[in-house]
């Protein structure tokens, strides 16, 4: 039996076989390559549909299947970030071979360059970037509000100046919907006001505006083949988060995101808000934690009922010589790796670990060779996708609590200074990362 948002239904055919065998864990955008699963493509499905496959008995973790017009997305899942219609240094074929079923693209950046109208005339974002998997687009709100002095906000919308040429732009809920419909993503996000998490007065004001904008987005959204997710805001204040969840669930979006986290609050505060907020969201709809994507945050987020994650962290760190291992981050610039013949991670099946040593990767990083950026990115994305697969398997087999304890006890979490998306040690002052403050990957 699989639980949906309507009623329990018995699956039939290949999808049922995949779920019954626990092999939902392997479903990707090309499921025929994984464990022999023959899953039909859902080419004419009107929008996203979420199936809750299995719950963990010892936590809020769950396994699900998100149906999109561009294939099945097993959850929990990590979405690589392709800000400008590309995951930096990787091709769509790379992502396919890594097993990524869904990526995120950025509305703000694509609206400014090359323009959503241009992309629409060229057949939409999937065709434009030659990606046949699912795409989630944000509304552009986070990038606009990160401009700080370059924007002005009112109930009508937000006026801002382009970081590219200084031109004045105006973004409203209706325009955010129009742009995302032109892009043709599988999942679109409402326009919301992103805030500093600790300022209660500002959060109260912004929350009212976020709810008004959510209603306007819902009225303006017209594409039947695109799911629109609401975004719960409210900073670190449980009562504001509860109010936001109440208002947005009443609007009956097909999915819900938790926004405004990992923007300055402590990890303990973030985890506490997730624990209190996730249970307030509909059980049979997907839950998306926006912009959060360190390995430990994936594990702790899944334990609290989150299904979907995205973050620039894995790709940004990779381009600056930092890679993930089972015991934490490795800084390949360290002299200790100068003659290290080992792969980044013993037993890792990614191309980088199958082929190259830490010593060689360190050489590429120090020599600033482009290949180093690519190989490190391949590993970090593989690590995140494999972590999601491992969690799906653990939930399916009833061993998630043991896995979580083992992972957290062995994984050395970066300190607070390094957690800020790789500032200082992990992110050298290079021009290629100078736009990190406006949400580039």
Question: How does the language model describe each region?
Answer:
Residues 40-65, 73-77, 88-89, 192-195, ...:
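C-terminal extensions of enzymes
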């Amino acid at each position: 039996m699989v639980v949906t948002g309507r009623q329990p239904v018995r699956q039939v055919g290949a999808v049922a076989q995949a779920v019954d065998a626990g092999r939902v864990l392997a479903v990707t955008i090309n499921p025929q390559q994984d464990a022999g699963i023959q899953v039909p493509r859902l080419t004419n499905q009107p929008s996203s549909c979420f199936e809750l496959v299995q719950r963990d008995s010892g936590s809020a973790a769950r396994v699900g299947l998100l149906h999109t017009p561009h294939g099945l997305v097993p959850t929990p899942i990590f979405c690589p970030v392709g800000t400008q219609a590309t995951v930096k240094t990787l091709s769509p074929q790379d992502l396919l071979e890594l097993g990524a079923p869904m990526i995120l693209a950025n509305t703000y950046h694509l609206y400014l360059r090359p323009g959503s109208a241009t992309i629409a005339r060229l057949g939409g974002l999937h065709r434009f970037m030659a990606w046949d998997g699912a795409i989630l687009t944000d509304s552009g709100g986070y990038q606009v509000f990160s401009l700080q002095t370059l924007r002005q906000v009112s109930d009508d919308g937000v006026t801002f100046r382009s970081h590219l040429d200084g031109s004045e732009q105006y973004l409203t809920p209706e325009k955010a919907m129009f742009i995302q419909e032109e892009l043709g993503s599988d999942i679109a996000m409402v326009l919301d006001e992103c805030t500093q998490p600790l300022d209660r007065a500002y959060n109260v004001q912004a929350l009212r505006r976020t709810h008004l904008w959510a209603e306007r987005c819902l009225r303006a959204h017209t594409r039947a083949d695109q799911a629109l997710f609401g975004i719960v805001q409210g900073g670190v204040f449980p009562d504001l988060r509860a109010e936001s969840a109440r208002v947005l669930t009443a609007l009956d979006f097909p999915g819900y995101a938790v926004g405004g986290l990992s923007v300055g609050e402590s990890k303990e505060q973030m985890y506490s808000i997730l624990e209190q907020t996730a249970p307030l969201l509909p059980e049979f709809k997907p839950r998306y934690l926006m912009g959060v994507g360190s390995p430990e945050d994936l594990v702790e987020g899944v334990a609290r009922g989150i299904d979907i994650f995205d973050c620039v962290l894995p790709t940004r760190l990779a381009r600056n010589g930092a890679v993930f291992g089972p015991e934490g981050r490795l800084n390949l610039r360290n002299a200790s790796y100068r003659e290290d013949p080992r792969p980044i991670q013993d037993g890792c099946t990614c191309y980088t670990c199958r082929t190259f040593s830490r010593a060689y990767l360190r050489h590429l990083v120090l020599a600033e060779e482009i290949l180093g950026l690519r190989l490190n990115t391949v590993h970090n994305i593989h690590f995140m996708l494999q972590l999601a697969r491992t969690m799906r398997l653990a939930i399916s087999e009833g061993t998630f609590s043991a896995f979580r304890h083992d992972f957290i006890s062995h994984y050395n979490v970066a300190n607070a200074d390094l957690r800020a998306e790789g500032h200082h040690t992990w992110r050298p002052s290079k021009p290629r990362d100078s736009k990190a403050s406006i949400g580039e990957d």
